[in-house]
Amino acid sequence: MSIDSLPPLREVIERHDLMPKKSLGQNFLFDLNLTSKIARQAGDLRDQPVIEVGPGPGGLTRALLAQGAYVTAIERDDRCLEALAEIAAHYPGRLRIIAGDALEQDFTALFPEGPKPRIVANLPYNVGTQLLLNWLLVEPWPPFYSSMTLMFQREVAERIVAKPDSDHYGRLGVLAGWRTQAKIAFDVPPQAFTPPPKVMSSVVHIVPRETPLPCRAEALGQITQAAFGQRRKMLRQSLKSIGGAALLEKTGIDGTRRAETLSVEEFVALANACLP
């Protein structure tokens, strides 16, 4: 079934009264060229499983299905379910719709066998960062997904790919750099969305590392949270609540340094020093 045989998105939104809700962080994409570009960025999707979070009225969903994917769409806004069901009727057996909150979803249980899914989504802005953190810290590793192609506010995208000694470097950059290889694929202007956000957006492509540096995710999460929670303070101060003096001595890291100067490898060393 061709994507062209579906009614225009604007018509669907009017018919189902689907004005985006600010409380849900919704910004809908109408540009079919753009949604197709996002789908292509995820790679060859023919007969491949894809997880989409926050599909809304299904603009990106249509593009993923048109590329031949088997899509599992997770949507918490009940208003959108009927519009998604109409798309599913055009692609029998290719669109599974799960009504619920992605933050409460057990993603590892969605695909118990077969190829690993790719995650492709225009994430709701109010939960996008937390979802990414959950996916970066998931156990076991390698993770349940083979790649992620995700839309974020530009500022969040820059934090994901940031390197030490840069303005955007922080906890997100350390965790992403430890377990994945991430790049900003392209930017998306505000006028591509309804309603237009006040900032530029970016699509980030993320591929898991098969063998990241050995480290407990929980420990690294704790270290980075403490270090960047007081990022302007020296490490001997910011890590004080978690026994920082002993950790710094054990790793040979200068306690007068600040969090943004440490490499991913140094953060991993601190996390491993937490082990008894």
From Swiss-Prot:
The keyword Cytoplasm applies. InterPro entries: KsgA/Erm, rRNA_Ade_diMease-like_C, rRNA_Ade_Mease_Trfase_CS, rRNA_Ade_methylase_Trfase_N, rRNA_adenine_dimethylase, SAM-dependent_MTases_sf. GO terms for cellular component: cytosol. It is found in: Cytoplasm. Its EC number is 2.1.1.182. S-adenosyl-L-methionine binds at N27, L29, G54, E75, D101, N122. Gene3D superfamilies: Ribosomal RNA adenine dimethylase-like, domain 2, Vaccinia Virus protein VP39. The keyword DNA damage does not apply. GO terms for molecular function: 16S rRNA (adenine(1518)-N(6)/adenine(1519)-N(6))-dimethyltransferase activity; RNA binding. Its main location: cytoplasm. It catalyses: adenosine(1518)/adenosine(1519) in 16S rRNA + 4 S-adenosyl-L-methionine = N(6)-dimethyladenosine(1518)/N(6)-dimethyladenosine(1519) in 16S rRNA + 4 S-adenosyl-L-homocysteine + 4 H(+). Keywords: Cytoplasm, Methyltransferase, RNA-binding, rRNA processing, S-adenosyl-L-methionine, Transferase. Belongs to the class I-like SAM-binding methyltransferase superfamily. rRNA adenine N(6)-methyltransferase family. RsmA subfamily. NCBIfam families: ksgA. Specifically dimethylates two adjacent adenosines (A1518 and A1519) in the loop of a conserved hairpin near the 3'-end of 16S rRNA in the 30S particle. May play a critical role in biogenesis of 30S subunits. This is Ribosomal RNA small subunit methyltransferase A. The gene is rsmA.
